[in-house]
Amino acid sequence: MKKFRYLTLIAAACLLFSSCSGETEAPADTTIPVETEPAAEPYTVLANGASDYVIIRPDIMDDRALSALLEFRKSIKEKYSVELPVKTDWTKENKDNNTVTSDESVLEILIGDTNRAETRALAEEYPDLKSGYVIKAVNGKIVIWGTDTASLTLALNQFAAEMLGDSSITVPGDYLRVWDLTGEGMPLDLIANNYTLICPQSAPDRVWNAANLFAKNIEDLSGVKPAVQADSKSSTSGKEILVGNTNRAESAAVGEILYMDYTIRISGDKIILLGGSPLATQSAIEKFLSLLKTGVISTLDSDFEYSSNYHELIADSIALNIDSFVPKWSSDFTVPAWMTDYEEKLYALTSPSGRMASDSHRGDVQNYPENSIPGILSAIMLGADVVEIDIRLTKDNIMVLMHDASLKRTTDWNQKKGKNGLPTSDQIADWTYEELCELRLLYDGKATDCIIPTMYEAALLFAGRSQIHFDCKVDDIDVNSDVFLLAEATDSKESFVYYYGISTMVKWQSLNKSDESFKQFVTKMSKYLSMSGHALRKRNFEMIEKHGDHIDGWKKGWNEGYKMTFTNKVYDFSKYLAANEGPIALP
């Protein structure tokens, strides 16, 4: 009797391990029978609570691929109470990581791009597979190989969903599964050949760059690059990917989206990728590509919607309930009312006859973690005229507060790395914001309840209370789109005048001419501001370097004409100021 093997094309199903890929759905099987030789004897991977198989992985493996592998092993342990050993493919006999010849007596599950002959042969057998995976039983081994991390994760999920039986794992000797994401009729193929990307004519560079990069990624995967054009033009086919707030009715129909959030929607011939900011729109584009590559979006013929929920992650933030905050020092020190008066602070910063002002370095670090919401709010309540904060971007384009590129110094990363699907990398750019919410900021070397805050939360604290010293640690932040729209969303535009100067405020005024209150603020401040924030900061640093960050240093600086101090001791400075200064007579 003739046997058949199955060439598997993926259409849509549920992922067994959603924690590995971050998605909740995955492709289902459509099988095409292909006539072949009689099947080989099946492989008994696990039976009677025991297994002789070992998982082999590459010596160097991507964090997320490794996380998927460990989740795969965990699922086997939870079902059968058997923990398969995991070893790397490195051997003393193969120091250069060259191909290890086949040994059928060694029972292995080869996961990823290992140096085993079976893995190499599989990759060579499918040279045209640009995005997808292959799972094959060969030479007593199970080979699970993907073109990228997302595809490998899907392969592990597919194998587990299909092969984890009631009491054993038995794999047919002719087992073969192939998934080609770019096959004819698949979403990537349809997008490449039938869709046009549409961007608003006036969209910032970030949106245009993200759209063009998406088109390039589609070309790399399918060999065909979709067109990218402004919304002032019509597409030939009518099938459009609407990027950002285009003039199309489908974009407007999405409605208002909060600053950090975005929506992905498939409706008829339109695919809408829309965020509440250019950064969020970029995230929507990147997420859409991920959903395509992981097979979550397996058809363009039915309606689909995915929305981010970043604002839900900050629902309990002090920034949304400022009046509930009671600082540690409240029972020891009462701040004079004039020190927290916003108009008084502005005059101190701009008037030659004003008192000495303070720029609090990363917030009230004497009492709270640096760059934390409690630390910033405490500094503001202590009367800080300016608070310096450091900005970085997460993997999913959320502006967060963090000085270092590494998470080692300021968080409990070392205790949580790699656990529960978290990345092992210490670089903040390798973590999504949702993943960062699992970490806690350190104070005096110990973990606190504070999470890494978003710039959105921080901006809410400053509005009408203090000025922002915005120290951006990455180059990819645009003042007149990313920062302006953040300031608009949080009603904090006035708080950026110290850092960006009056010329930027005039530019921002032109971006929203209907904001009369901001127009009046710009007119007023233009009379007083004679130095840019950069020049002011330079003098602040000079004073600290010359005299030190303490009472004697502040006194000497004041006597020499310095008008501001850049301090790590805002609590001490505020007590000094309260004892030695009085309110300024405002003009």
Task: Specify the residue positions occupied by each region the protein language model found.
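Bacterial N-terminal signal peptides that target proteins for export
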Residues: 1-7
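C-terminal motif of bacterial Sec signal peptides marking the signal peptidase cleavage site
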Residues: 16-19
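Bacterial lipoprotein signal-peptidase II cleavage site
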Residues: 21-28
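N-terminal low-complexity, Pro/Thr/Ser-rich intrinsically disordered segments
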Residues: 29-49, 178-188, 329-358
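Short, charged N-terminal beta->alpha structural module
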Residues: 55-80, 197-220
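Carboxylate-rich, divalent-cation-coordinating active-site regions
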Residues: 85-184, 188-190, 208, 221, ...
